[in-house]
From Swiss-Prot:
Region feature (Putative leucine zipper motif): 458-479
Species whose genome carries this gene: Varicella-zoster virus (strain Dumas) (HHV-3)
Compartments (UniProt record): Virion; Host nucleus
Renumbered residue ranges of the record's region Disordered: 654-675, 750-769
Protein name stated in the entry: Portal protein
HAMAP family the record matches: HSV_PORTL (MF_04012)
Subunit: Homododecamerizes. Interacts with terminase subunits TRM1 and TRM3.
Keyword Disulfide bond appears in the UniProt entry: yes
Entry keyword set: Disulfide bond, Host nucleus, Viral genome packaging, Viral release from host cell, Virion
GO cellular component annotations of the record: host cell nucleus; virion component
Bias kind Basic and acidic residues: ranges: 760-769
Amino acid sequence: MAEITSLFNNSSGSEEKRIASSVSIDQGLNGSNPNDQYKNMFDIYWNEYAPDIGFCTFPEEDGWMLIHPTTQSMLFRKILAGDFGYTDGQGIYSAVRSTETVIRQVQATVLMNALDATRYEDLAADWEHHIQQCNLHAGALAERYGLCGESEAVRLAHQVFETWRQTLQSSLLEFLRGITGCLYTSGLNGRVGFAKYVDWIACVGIVPVVRKVRSEQNGTPAPLNTYMGQAAELSQMLKVADATLARGAAVVTSLVECMQNVAIMDYDRTRLYYNYNRRLIMAKDDVTGMKGECLVVWPPVVCGEGVVFDSPLQRLSGEVLACYALREHARVCQVLNTAPLRVLIGRRNEDDRSHSTRAVDRIMGENDTTRAGSAASRLVKLIVNLKNMRHVGDITETVRSYLEETGNHILEGSGSVDTSQPGFGKANQSFNGGAMSGTTNVQSAFKTSVVNSINGMLEGYVNNLFKTIEGLKDVNSDLTERLQFKEGELKRLREERVKIKPSKGSHITMAEETRIADLNHEVIDLTGIIGDDAYIANSFQSRYIPPYGDDIKRLSELWKQELVRCFKLHRVNNNQGQEISVSYSNASISLLVAPYFSFILRATRLGFLVTQSEVHRSEEELCQAIFKKARTESYLSQIRILYEMQVRAEVIKRGPRRTPSPSWGLPDPTEDDERIPEPNKINNQYMHVGYKNLSHFMKGHPPERLRVHKVNAADSTLLDKIRANRRRGDGRWDVRNKYTQHFRLQRNDRQLTNTSRRGVGCERRDRRS
């Protein structure tokens, strides 16, 4: 109110006065709004951030700045959606967005308003109609069940009334629940959804809404009209149903109208402008161009770099991004900074070397001189030379050099060979050749034979290789076609991935994927490590990921602490300290639910807010609890008490009933029915409670003197005679102990009986013990 007064005092134009006046009217400061109890929560900022201010110059006027959408504000919404990861603590936000409390508040509002419309006259008339139809009025109950005693008759009357009360309650609540159900289709989760309201508060602390002019064409919702037609039968049976159902329908119609006349603007298509000089916030829809008003729960703060919002996401966003960056760094380290191939090298002991290696060493000799001259070393040298060949023509030279080196050892006895024998050719039979000519021919023939044998073997091997190569070409052609198809499909998927941004998962771009794919393999040189006594035991891939589990755990705890303390939530734990559930507390209901109905919907028939215990109750339990708090319960209690008193009076009026004698020997005053005439009823009229109740009272706490209330004697001459004969000067009997009382009451009973009989003309001698 002080802010509005300052507007009047400081403004020079009529526009500011009109603005302040409209704000005061909208906020119910003139006393017409029943929700003034919540005004103080938002009076400063709600009055300053008023609707319909400056739209004529907005946003061309100097001083306006865009505060949403920005990179920061859109980042808040992504964090809520889990785009930067999701932790256990963030799950508490689902409890904040739950509409359970709003639904319970709507049910309580409709039920309480409807039940408070009950009139006492209607309830009394319905009760009288019921007992007359069932013949259960007080006189009938006393006549039929009075013989069972006064207490039993009253207990029966109580049960009769409770039966009718339960039936009435079930009938009313059933139809009221049906009326409330018609409200759920009106948009509690739609354009004016409570979840959207909470999202705006959690992100920026501001809720922009668009209102439309109230029209008379809204009328009553169609489902409600249908249901009210079905409730006509109940109205014919119960008079109280007319006012109750009419009030309930009126409340539902009012709430539906409030929901239809307002819409909470969407987060992704709304622009928020802030005027620092005038301290105003405006909202505008990007698509429709509609301008709306703003409910500012927590005002923003202007700093050098822009605007800082006073919201939970503003405080949590830095930690969320830091933890996300750490996880991304771990993934980059996994992909880029870690050598994927590791080699495990083992050392051999002398005893672990294979048998073939020891055999080769033994054959080749123990020292280098022996190895150089041994046939085994020459054979190994031949194998190495064959392995290092680059052309097929090198085979002849390699074999000839080996044969020249070893020919003297292989053909040492070739001089005694007679080459003139058949099989060595005619050229060798000449006389001039001699012994040396024969030896040379043998060596040449041996070399030629060995070379031809190796060439034949290699020719067959090469032919097999050509066949294998032809087969591999066919297989390679097929694999090439399949690879090209897969590459084309992969390229198409990458292009689609670039066009459609994923809401979750990896944030690696196309260029980054290309760079990762083009990475060269890391070459590890093991020449200096692996020797003759070493071997490669195993090779494996290893992924190094920097640990970030502690950071995620800390972030989860931050989510829990911020949401619970900011929204005043109530955490329910078991005996072991483990969290079972998170729910709204009474402070949460006042912080979120009350402004939602008061300032967003502007509901004028809200009534009392639901409590924390009522939110967790079932629908049936909530209805019963509200029924007990409504004025209907008070009316029914009064009708019940009056009905029980009527039954009690009727039982007393019809005289005493035969009851068992007291445990300590008091005689029953009604033992002889002829002693007391029917019209007089001496015992009940004179002593009011009877001997049974009197004896019970005296047995527990026997008084020294017992006052017996006097009866007005103007109605009967007989009672005057009784009083004159038995009354003492002070109108009291002395009661010394229970035995004296017993005998005196016995004597008084006899004398009272005889006196009454004399009064009616029955003369009889007093029987004395």
